[in-house]
């Protein structure tokens, strides 16, 4: 087996996502000599974790003002997670769109999707996204092997799964 790409939630600033991505990378490396986490970080996902919001409005301004007392803690947390990602993950270059993923997938003989709730359109990262750009659909035309590893659909209905 050649190089294996891993498509997962790896860049959320929470311990669960970071550790599941690391565990998935370790598990896949048992079956593939070379693994790489595809650094797919959609703008909608990045905006959840940004320190400085670019959308304007009274509500956003008020929320930002309320965050000022903990700004330095939030910044420190973000920096620590980014350091962890860069130190422990074997990452591809950053991909912000499905097209970016398409442009690099020829380097992989297989792509593993998972683990975590990569198919749960009710997750925080996916609620604001166009569902057709999400993980199962990004790989729809991938010519290599597509593997799902410990993926969860959470509480999606049968009707939602037909999408």
Please state what every model-predicted region is.
Residues 1:
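Phosphate-coordination loops involved in phosphoryl transfer and adenosine-cofactor binding
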Residues 4-15, 19-20, 24-162:
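Aromatic- and Gly/Pro-rich donor/ligand-binding loops
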């Amino acid at each position: 087996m050649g190089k294996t790409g891993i498509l997962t939630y790896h860049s959320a600033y929470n311990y669960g996502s970071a550790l599941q991505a690391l565990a998935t990378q370790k598990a896949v490396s048992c079956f593939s000599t070379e693994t790489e986490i595809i650094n797919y970080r959609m703008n909608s996902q990045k905006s959840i974790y940004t320190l400085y919001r670019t959308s304007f409005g009274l509500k956003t301004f008020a929320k930002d003002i309320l965050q000022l007392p903990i700004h330095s803690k939030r910044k420190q947390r973000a920096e620590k997670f980014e350091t962890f990602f860069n130190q422990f993950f074997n990452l591809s270059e950053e991909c912000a769109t499905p097209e970016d993923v398409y442009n690099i997938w020829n380097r992989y003989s297989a792509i593993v999707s998972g683990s975590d709730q990569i198919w749960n359109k009710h997750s925080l990262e996916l609620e604001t996204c166009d569902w057709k750009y999400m993980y199962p659909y990004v790989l729809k035309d991938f010519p290599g092997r597509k593997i799902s590893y410990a993926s969860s659909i959470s509480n999606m209905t049968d009707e939602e799964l037909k999408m």
